């Protein structure tokens, strides 16, 4: 797909170098031209966005200088709520639902002057690795329309890649920001658990879910993260650790930084072209002054089963609230309360969501809790300890983001296990609670984007972004 324009940076819009209304019109033009094929946006607020952009343009230079996102057009994954706007989680079960509250991360962007364009397609309830599980149709990868954009935040990644937004928000439970960023050739950031409020997020797995940004550049992603990060009294898991200026040391380079390369992430199953691109980038970082050290994260082989036990268990509890009683879809023919619950959930949930609810209910059931859920929590602790030990020796860890470039639409739809393995390099960070990012580092022979994953200590997003900026600079 050919793109007619290159969107301005956040800085260009914020400073008034590019008018807010002009930036918005560029995004809307791309949406009108490409969304019919890509299917990234589920809903748009054209009138509200236009009024907001004109308001920002009418501000004085002094007033605009107080708004770190002044006039920046952005979209949000449709698992984040906005008061009065439809919230679907890409599921039929939330048909017609308009929440009475706005997610904190979204509100912080709006308060900072950003212009909300609309809400973005995703896998249903954020469950998926390809964005083929949406009740509103799959998202297509703007880099190759026969390929998936990744999941579950495929719409958020595709919107940035197709110039439909300067930046977007997604969520990441097991790789749902980083893997789509890799597949679509954009930057995606996973904040530390607790760094960004989850208030207003329609939950999948509450101990794993994070909210984070997509952008064209590391600097733009860093600026968005700086706005949405910070303590929120509305989220009991929100951290009060101070938020630094993420742009302050972006250009410091990697000289003197210790970068760990875990052997377990370069084993069987890694596509040769991904391996070539990532290893080539690591060598460039070494040449730029980084100290590259081999490390081991020995419990990595247990990460996928551990993740799918814990995530599905939490999902089965979180999704119990969708029953047709207070909001969303209600089965019209049910004549008893039990029948209404059963029929509503059968009509409203897609196949992948049902699969995960069943698995989660099973691992929490009497007789299986100790064998599966309790054991998974013990392995989760071992995975976290692997990272704690590694970060005693290194400042950041670099790996492939995904084992392959974007695969073809429909290629893995009938093979859930193969689909789950697409997250093999990303679920560990969610289980350990650490931060990370995916930054483009090359392309395959077919021209498909490849991303490198950078993982950092708890609340050390600044170092992750610093390494990401170095990677980005090396690609130019």
UniProtKB/Swiss-Prot annotation:
Gene3D superfamilies: Amidase signature (AS) domain (3.90.1300.10). InterPro entries: Amidase, Amidase_CS, Amidase_dom, AS_sf, GatA. It catalyses: L-glutamyl-tRNA(Gln) + L-glutamine + ATP + H2O = L-glutaminyl-tRNA(Gln) + L-glutamate + ADP + phosphate + H(+). GO terms for cellular component: glutamyl-tRNA(Gln) amidotransferase complex. Its EC number is 6.3.5.7. The active site is at residues 77, 152, 176. The keyword Nucleotide-binding applies. It comes from the Bacteria. GO terms for molecular function: ATP binding; glutaminyl-tRNA synthase (glutamine-hydrolyzing) activity. It is an enzyme of class 6 (ligase). Keywords: ATP-binding, Ligase, Nucleotide-binding, Protein biosynthesis. Allows the formation of correctly charged Gln-tRNA(Gln) through the transamidation of misacylated Glu-tRNA(Gln) in organisms which lack glutaminyl-tRNA synthetase. The reaction takes place in the presence of glutamine and ATP through an activated gamma-phospho-Glu-tRNA(Gln). HAMAP family: GatA. This is Glutamyl-tRNA(Gln) amidotransferase subunit A. It comes from Acidobacterium capsulatum (strain ATCC 51196 / DSM 11244 / BCRC 80197 / JCM 7670 / NBRC 15755 / NCIMB 13165 / 161). The lineage of its organism: Bacteria, Pseudomonadati, Acidobacteriota, Terriglobia, Terriglobales. The gene is gatA.
